[in-house]
């Protein structure tokens, strides 16, 4: 898994609070257990005018031409509330989002996003409002996220954010739970060699 250090990308301004995981990925699309293929169903009930997902809703922000190819999602408070389905960050990642910015995230969704190598950034409501206003006034312009410096640069303004150092280390180095374990492979092997034969 590639490490995440910096990203310059388009921002989709999803002007909604309390966006729950059922809105992010509706329950009828949860049958699969692999992480791919969910992007086409992201925000399905808002994004499409029909059940089959063949008629895009022109009034939904993800369908606006100026936001195609966006890699950063901007939202209001309590993003990812509701059920704890891990399919929600899977769908966001499969669509192409790498960063989410909001005043707050539901705890399980926040951790699931980090586990799936996405960066959820918490900024104050005032800072998020400033970014919304900038994005609306500067459509099709990119912002810059720097995980090493822990900053978000929007136009000529720089915002700082916080992230647990362990989580930051994992993102910077592209480490998931398996990768973290393999960092200690030599110690695991040494321990296993000392296990009595009758316990192996």
Curated annotation (Swiss-Prot):
InterPro entries for this protein: 3-IsopropMal_deHydase_ssu, Aconitase/3IPM_dehydase_swvl, AconitaseA/IPMdHydase_ssu_swvl, IPMI_Swivel, LeuD
Catalytic activity: (2R,3S)-3-isopropylmalate = (2S)-2-isopropylmalate
Residues in the signal sequence: none
Pfam families assigned to the protein according to its UniProt record, in alphabetical order: Aconitase_C
EC annotation from Swiss-Prot or TrEMBL: 4.2.1.33
Domain of life: Bacteria
Enzyme class: lyase
NCBIfam families per the UniProt record, alphabetical: leuD (TIGR00171), PRK01641.1 (NF002458)
Molecular function per GO: 3-isopropylmalate dehydratase activity
Chain's role: Catalyzes the isomerization between 2-isopropylmalate and 3-isopropylmalate, via the formation of 2-isopropylmaleate.
Subunit structure, as described in the record: Heterodimer of LeuC and LeuD.
Family matches, as SUPFAM superfamilies: LeuD/IlvD-like
GO biological process, one term: L-leucine biosynthetic process
Alphabetical list of Gene3D superfamilies matching this protein: Aconitase, domain 4 (3.20.19.10)
GO cellular component, one term: 3-isopropylmalate dehydratase complex
Protein name: 3-isopropylmalate dehydratase small subunit
Pathway: Amino-acid biosynthesis; L-leucine biosynthesis; L-leucine from 3-methyl-2-oxobutanoate: step 2/4
Gene: leuD
């Amino acid at each position: 898994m590639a490490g995440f250090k910096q990203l310059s990308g388009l921002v989709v301004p999803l002007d909604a609070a309390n966006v729950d995981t059922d809105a992010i990925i509706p329950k009828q699309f949860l049958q699969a257990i692999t992480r791919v293929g969910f992007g086409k169903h992201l925000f399905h009930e808002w994004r499409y005018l029909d059940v089959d997902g063949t008629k895009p809703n022109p009034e939904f922000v993800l369908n606006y031409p100026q936001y195609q190819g966006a890699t950063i999602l901007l939202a209001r408070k309590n993003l990812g509330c509701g059920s704890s389905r891990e399919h929600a960050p899977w769908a966001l990642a499969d669509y192409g989002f790498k960063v989410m910015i909001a005043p707050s995230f539901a705890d399980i969704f926040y951790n699931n996003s980090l586990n799936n190598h996405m960066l959820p950034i918490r900024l104050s409501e005032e800072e998020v409002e400033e970014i919304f206003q900038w994005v609306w006034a500067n459509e099709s312009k990119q912002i810059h996220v720097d995980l090493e410096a822990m900053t978000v640069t929007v136009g000529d303004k720089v915002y700082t954010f916080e992230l647990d150092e362990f989580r930051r280390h994992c993102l910077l180095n592209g480490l998931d739970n398996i990768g973290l374990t393999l960092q200690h492979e030599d110690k695991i092997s040494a321990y296993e060699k000392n296990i009595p034969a009758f316990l192996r």
